[in-house]
């Protein structure tokens, strides 16, 4: 990437309202993960630009319930003829609910999404060519493995094509191959082959700007460094995360884990690391989430005599997360393969201090003055690192309130959805008048 432009210039947003066609195949205000990201970015952009969203038919009813008008605000593309059988096939091949996400992503991005784009171009191609839109922006799919066949067509029509934030496919860290196999991530061993695709090369050449959600994803687009910028895909809705955690700076410390109970997120590693503090009463732990590791954790907690210190809450509706998470002082989150880290930003927005494994997404969000990072290593090294980090916090709980305040300030400065819309607006300005280096609006940890 080129040197960063002025921070003020990079975050001020577009200079004028633009006519933007936002492609958000996955976008839904009633879901979480990628669909919520797609919805949130598209909605934030609507406050600054004249946006028309193109989404998949499965999201239509949620858009209508949210008050959007079909035809004026959005168009729902019916690609179910391909999407439905592909989803059924993926469910078979993933070999277990909640597993094999690389397989699911590959089938969707290589088979279902191209059909969606073909139908999109049939409807919007003439309008794009006629100059009805200033910019075409693909927000989702989030995965960098999904090629956009319409990118060269937009370029031929003279309309800038922007992609991103793109993220995903973070390599499994060394020492976690057993967890990789337990997650049925067989396809991850050959994921890198997608970079050989000719259609991918054509897409990259045609894109006016590529927004990467992480340094890893940015490294996969090195040939487009002059058009590459970094903006993490996750953000915060201040209305949804409006509570503030009490930070008395005293013991016991209330810690929380939020996420699916699967091997790579490491809830079992967390219990092992925190056991001495859970046992002596200096710490209590709330685990919010469900998944295949639930019976393992139940047995682990009972077998170690920690039932008074650890509460397994099970699945929690996303709208209710802030009520429970804001009762904690720490988010203890040893996930070893988190490409985004939305829950880390949610904790910071509540004034809850993150303690995370320093790898991929979370490691780029948490700075030394906003949380605690544990070096990545083998499973045993991560457990030992978390235990040492927790021991330091137990010994000095009065340091936590300052970290919490700085974490909240960082989110408000860079990671609300409105801030993200302004950051993307600065990219729009640049693609329409590319003077100087492409803006780099978000300071990541380590910079």
Go through each PLM region and give its residues:
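Donor nucleotide-sugar binding/catalytic pocket of nucleotide-sugar-dependent glycosyltransferases
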Residues: 160-161, 189-244, 250
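Aromatic "clamp/platform" in nucleotide-sugar-dependent glycosyltransferases that forms part
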Residues: 336
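Acceptor-binding helix/loop patch of EC 2.4 sugar-transfer enzymes
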Residues: 14, 25, 84-108, 155-198
């Amino acid at each position: 990437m080129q040197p960063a432009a002025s921070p003020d210039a990079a975050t001020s947003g577009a200079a004028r309202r633009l006519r933007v066609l936002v492609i958000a195949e996955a976008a839904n205000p009633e879901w979480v993960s990628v669909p919520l990201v797609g919805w949130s970015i598209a909605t934030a952009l609507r406050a600054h630009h004249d946006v028309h969203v193109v989404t998949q038919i499965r999201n239509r009813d949620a858009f209508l319930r949210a008050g959007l008008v079909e035809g004026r605000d959005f168009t729902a593309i019916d690609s179910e003829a391909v999407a439905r059988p592909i989803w059924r096939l993926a469910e078979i091949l993933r070999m277990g609910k909640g597993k094999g996400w690389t397989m699911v992503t590959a089938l969707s991005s290589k088979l279902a999404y191209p059909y969606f784009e073909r139908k999109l171009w049939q409807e919007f191609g003439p309008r794009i060519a006629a100059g009805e839109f200033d910019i075409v922006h693909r927000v989702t799919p989030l995965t960098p493995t999904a090629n956009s066949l319409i990118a060269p067509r937009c370029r031929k029509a003279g309309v800038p094509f922007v992609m991103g934030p793109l993220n995903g496919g973070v390599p499994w860290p060394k020492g976690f191959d057993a967890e990789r196999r337990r997650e049925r991530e067989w396809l991850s061993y050959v994921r890198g082959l997608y970079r050989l695709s000719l259609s991918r090369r054509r897409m990259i050449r045609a894109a006016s700007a590529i927004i990467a959600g992480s340094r890893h994803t940015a490294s996969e687009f090195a040939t487009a460094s002059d058009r590459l910028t970094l903006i993490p895909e996750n953000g915060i809705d201040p209305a949804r995360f409006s509570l503030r955690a009490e930070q008395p700076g005293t013991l016991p410390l209330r810690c929380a884990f939020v996420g699916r109970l699967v091997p790579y997120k490491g809830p079992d590693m967390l219990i092992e690391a925190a056991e001495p503090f859970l046992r002596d009463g200096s710490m209590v732990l709330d685990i919010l989430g469900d998944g295949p590791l639930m019976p393992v954790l139940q047995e682990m907690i009972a077998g170690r005599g920690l039932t008074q210190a650890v509460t397994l809450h099970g699945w929690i509706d996303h709208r209710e997360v802030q009520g429970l998470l804001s009762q904690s002082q720490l988010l203890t989150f040893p996930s070893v393969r988190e490409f985004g880290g939305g829950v880390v930003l949610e904790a910071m927005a509540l004034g809850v201090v993150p303690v995370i494994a320093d790898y991929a997404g979370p490691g780029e969000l948490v700075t030394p003055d906003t949380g605690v990072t544990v070096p990545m290593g083998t499973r045993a090294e991560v457990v030992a690192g978390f235990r040492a980090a927790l021991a330091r916090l137990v010994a000095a709980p009065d340091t936590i309130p300052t970290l919490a305040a700085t974490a909240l300030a960082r989110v408000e400065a860079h990671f609300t959805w409105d801030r993200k819309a302004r950051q993307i607006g600065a990219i729009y300005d640049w693609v329409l008048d590319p003077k100087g280096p492409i803006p780099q609006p978000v300071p990541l940890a380590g910079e």
